[in-house]
Amino acid sequence: TALETTPEEVKELVSGKTLVTVAQINEWVGNQVARNGHNLIFPYPEKSLVLVQSAKERMLVDFKQKKVEWKQSIPQQAQHQDWHAGSRNLAYTVQGNLFVLTSEDKSLQISTDGSTDGTDNIVYGRSVHRDEFGIRKGTFWSPDGQKLAFYRMDQSMVPSYPQVDISTRISTTYTDHYPMAGETSHQVKVGIYDVATEKTVWMQLVGGPEDYHTNLSWAPDGKTLYIFELNRAQNDMRLMAYDVETGKCLKQLLQEKSDKYVEPQHGLDFLPWDETKAIMQSQRDGYNHLYVLDVTTGNATQLTKGNWVVQELVGF
């Protein structure tokens, strides 16, 4: 169903029927949590549930039953929150360490050696590699939300440089680890945490310690993790497949080289009707285009072509 949101309510686009109003949600919740209809999220297409979140709580409100079905308290100081709608598990960071809060409010600490002194020498669950190559976050839930792939970044060997924060009313300074060209870069590892066993498996990454590990993508069955790995010179990229249970590298699916640069920006988007094939984006012909990748063979068939670029894959 297509929906139309306004600051006051949410309507069905075709019929014009009002599904729920902001005032109704606040009445059922018991306080002024919902402030704008544009911010309401409907995470389940087949259910009458709307996700409402404040700084302290995350709630699922049933607008047909007119009540709160489920709620989760958000831990204090929680940052980089990553909530999975299926399992309702929440990944988050506090300072340099990574945690999971289960749907039953059980708190699980994944890491203990992350920096807590403000240096950010070692951090978990954050965006890495200077936010390049499509990296926008540091946690990646499996399709069922029971396993969490995450980054661990050690930048203790990288000098800190003063920076200016101009987002504040009066600009302030802070320090930031920045690897200058030719100098030692930070080192990144990829781990997978199993919520059920409370254990972490580290991927046995192929390549050098300063390689870029980008665009992590889960297989639909949750058994394989795909990583686009790029050398520091940024001219040699390999798509690798890793076994989630053991961390071992299963195979190299493909390799792209360039005398200029290779710039992976997107993960794999698997076809809903065929788990062996995924849409891959590549600039191998000089323009960003779509390819159908067979993950069993590594063969990539070009789907779009021309002297133009694909800006975005909207969906299926």
Regions found by a protein language model. Name each.
Residues 1-316:
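Beta-propeller folds
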